[in-house]
């Protein structure tokens, strides 16, 4: 059962780091390796609830830091019974936060069947499962589209509720800043300081209480699946997402 929440959608509103907020966590990816104190890995090839094609690894071939960027690379190769490998990094158990302003500067890959994402899950996912834990998708892109999607998922009346919006068209392969403003009343998502999404969560309206807990980050590049489809172009690989930085600010 899907519940639709009343929301408002705004375009081209200037955003950015709110006044009085200070930097509380960041990764600039300027070292020679992924910071294990900040990032862990999801590993496996079970489809991740979406019938994805890839096997996520912790190998250097799929995720590494070089040239001031985090590289998450999807590769066509036979590995653990799968035809593709990639990486899914997360801050679960290392950095989790409630409310604030977060931004990441990212170059997003395009290609038929590719599915890069910068997103968040509630820290209590192991206790309450999904979607009760809540999910905030700051940036998702699929296939060869030149646009991105922002979506929230949660549980309402025993079922899955969601609300999403898409951006206008732009060259997602260039670096852009994807940001989240999140307080006790609203979730807002922007691209290059132009707001594309707003959802009201004040007082848990629409059964959105999950969004008043701590969340952690996830960065990944999936291959195939229920949303992008199963007609993957094998000639695009290797294909990678580059992340310049991630920063979190709070009052």
Task: Identify the meaning behind each predicted range.
Residues 3-12:
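Sec-dependent N-terminal signal peptides
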Residues 15-251:
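GH16 jelly-roll
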């Amino acid at each position: 059962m899907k519940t639709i929440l009343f929301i408002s959608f705004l375009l081209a509103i200037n955003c950015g780091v709110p006044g009085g907020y200070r930097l509380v966590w960041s990764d600039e990816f300027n070292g020679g390796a992924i910071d294990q104190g900040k990032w862990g890995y999801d590993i496996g090839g079970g489809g991740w609830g979406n019938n994805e094609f890839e096997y996520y690894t912790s190998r250097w071939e799929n995720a590494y830091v070089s040239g001031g960027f985090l590289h998450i690379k999807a590769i066509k190769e036979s590995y653990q019974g799968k035809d593709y490998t990639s990486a899914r990094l997360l801050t679960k158990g290392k950095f989790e936060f409630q409310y604030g302003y977060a931004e990441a500067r990212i170059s997003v890959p395009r290609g038929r069947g590719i599915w890069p994402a910068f997103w968040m899950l509630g820290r209590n996912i192991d206790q309450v499962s999904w979607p009760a834990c809540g999910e905030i998708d700051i940036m998702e892109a699929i296939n060869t589209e030149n646009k991105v999607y922002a979506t929230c998922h949660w549980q309402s009346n025993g079922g899955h509720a969601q609300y999403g919006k898409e951006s206008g068209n732009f060259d997602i392969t260039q670096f852009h800043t994807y940001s989240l403003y999140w307080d006790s009343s609203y979730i807002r998502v922007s691209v290059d300081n132009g707001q594309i999404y707003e959802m009201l969560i004040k007082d848990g309206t629409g059964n959105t209480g999950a969004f008043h807990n701590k969340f952690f980050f996830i960065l990944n590049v999936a291959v195939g699946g229920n949303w992008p489809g199963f007609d993957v172009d094998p000639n695009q690989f290797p294909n990678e997402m580059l992340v310049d930085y991630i920063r979190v600010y709070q009052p």
